């Protein structure tokens, strides 16, 4: 049986209690949503990817916090009871970076190595090796394809990666102490 949304190798998904990741396919009635995520993806907290037809995400793509990708309007324009409206496939080619809270709408193709600025709304295709930003997203700058280093290179040296993660862990956890843990155990924050 084919997976509804296969996730590529070496994917990094970062969820938080206030930033749950939502990967959804709508498979009811005539709708047969599919989602394919390539290798080396980075999906940050609060990302929502919703498919009623097909969303294809290439290798080494990155999603900033709260980014939203959909291939549907989720309701008909005239018939508001029409559940998924008229979905259109979305394609993100390899090494695309979607900024925080950006919205990628149905029917869009984003070319390889492109960057979508934070808070942008993309309703039309994006050329490869480009930066687009704004609402609606507009061309900002052409990128030199020869200068681009894809996310998969992050994994090319496992020893360096391990060392980098140890440094990162020390930075993130440096303020954690036994006393802090005991205090949090007995005086819990009501939100956690």
Predicted regions and their residues:
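A short, glycine- and basic residue-enriched loop/turn
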Residues: 90, 107-108, 129
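Short-chain dehydrogenase/reductase
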Residues: 62, 97, 115, 121, ...
